[in-house]
From Swiss-Prot:
Presence of keyword Manganese: yes
Gene: cas1-2
Gene3D superfamilies the UniProt entry points to: CRISPR-associated endonuclease Cas1, C-terminal domain, CRISPR-associated endonuclease Cas1, N-terminal domain
Enzyme category, top tier: hydrolase
Protein name: CRISPR-associated endonuclease Cas1 2
Any one GO BP annotation for this protein: defense response to virus
GO MF annotations, alphabetized: DNA binding; DNA endonuclease activity; metal ion binding
HAMAP family: Cas1
Function: CRISPR (clustered regularly interspaced short palindromic repeat), is an adaptive immune system that provides protection against mobile genetic elements (viruses, transposable elements and conjugative plasmids). CRISPR clusters contain spacers, sequences complementary to antecedent mobile elements, and target invading nucleic acids. CRISPR clusters are transcribed and processed into CRISPR RNA (crRNA). Acts as a dsDNA endonuclease. Involved in the integration of spacer DNA into the CRISPR cassette.
EC annotation from Swiss-Prot or TrEMBL: 3.1.-.-
Biased composition (Acidic residues): 315-325
Organism: Thermus thermophilus (strain ATCC 27634 / DSM 579 / HB8)
Length: 325
């Protein structure tokens, strides 16, 4: 491995948003170096700060030392194991104590029928380039969404010359589908991986879906569907127009390039945060986020009480005065 003196110093990290930076690494060895992490690859050693790093994505061909993982955890950095270009999400390791505030907001919106419907309508509205008319029912919006999707397929079929006979694939016989359907399915898996990574990294649950339900990745499907018409559909049709060979591999490459150029990961993060704003849910600062070592609160009928406190006196039945909520 090259000496540290020849290292590049990665001072500027890409960000989901202000305060949460991320780094994607593949075909490299990650070690603890000089108070941060060192990334050894074919180009040499790159030093990356840890204090400002929110998420480290480890792609194919990556190894990481125990010392590096420990340092990342101590600094509150999430480590995620993903596929090439974040095409799939495999596992994660959470650094230090993380706030559950965003998950709570998602869960409250999911459990309240009125808020649930509002989030569903927001998700549908985000798919359209023009504002939807006021007063539409959910059934009417679903109908408009179906028309939008069919129009997207028809448009790219015309522009690329690739015949389109409808969305069709057989889970038991992958090769039975035509090339463009295989490209769409392979590309969708890529998009799901990216959405999964964004959701988990920001502290939301992939299981609590609003439009989609019943699956552990329901919310992943909700979010990925926002970007299919802009990214997946054109990439699939263009890939097949170039050649019908190896469309699965080539569409993933095309999607990766389009996603990087369009900074889609950052856009996903902003869309996720905006989705739950303005719902009348508490917006106050979360003390756990400010101090990750601070104990969480304890549930109580009157609200939350302070955690990390020994309640109860020396005598049976004697209780210490509980601190104010």
């Amino acid at each position: 491995m090259p000496p540290v003196s020849s290292a590049r110093n990665l001072k500027e990290l890409p960000k989901f948003r202000d305060g949460l930076s991320y780094l994607y690494v593949e075909h490299a060895v990650v070690e603890r170096e000089a108070g941060g992490i060192g990334i050894y690859d074919q180009e040499g050693l790159t030093l990356a700060p840890v204090a400002g790093l929110g998420v480290l994505f480890l792609g194919p061909g990556t190894r990481i030392t125990h010392a590096a993982v420990r340092l990342l955890a101590e600094n509150g950095c999430t480590v995620a194991w993903v596929g090439e270009g974040m095409a799939r999400f495999y596992a994660q390791g959470l650094g230090d104590t993380r706030s559950a505030a965003r998950f709570y907001r998602q869960a409250r919106a999911w459990a309240d029928p009125a808020l649930h419907l509002e989030v569903v309508m927001r998700l549908y509205r985000m798919r359209f380039s023009e504002p939807l008319p006021e007063g539409l029912t959910l059934e009417q919006v679903r109908g408009l969404e179906g028309v939008r999707v069919r129009n997207a397929y028809a448009r790219w079929s015309r522009e690329t010359g690739v015949p389109w006979y409808g969305r069709s694939y057989d889970r038991g016989n992958w090769r039975a589908a035509d090339p463009v359907n295989r490209a769409l399915s392979a590309g969708a898996s890529y998009l799901y991986g990216l959405a999964h990574a964004a959701i988990v990294s920001l502290g939301f649950s992939p299981a609590l879906g609003f439009i989609h339900t019943g699956k552990l990745l329901s919310f992943v499907y909700d979010i990925a569907d926002l970007y299919k018409a802009d990214y997946l559909v054109p990439a699939a049709f263009r890939t097949v127009a170039e050649s019908e060979e190896a469309v699965e591999r080539r569409v993933r490459r095309a999607l990766r390039e389009a996603i990087q150029e369009g900074r889609l990961l950052e856009r996903m993060a902003e869309d996720l945060l905006n989705l739950f704003r303005g719902l009348g849910l508490p917006e106050e600062e979360d003390p756990v986020e400010e101090d990750p070592t601070r104990p969480g609160g304890l549930w109580d009928l009157e609200g939350e009480v302070e955690g990390g406190v020994a309640y109860g006196g020396d005598d049976p039945g004697e209780g210490a005065e509980e601190p104010e909520g």
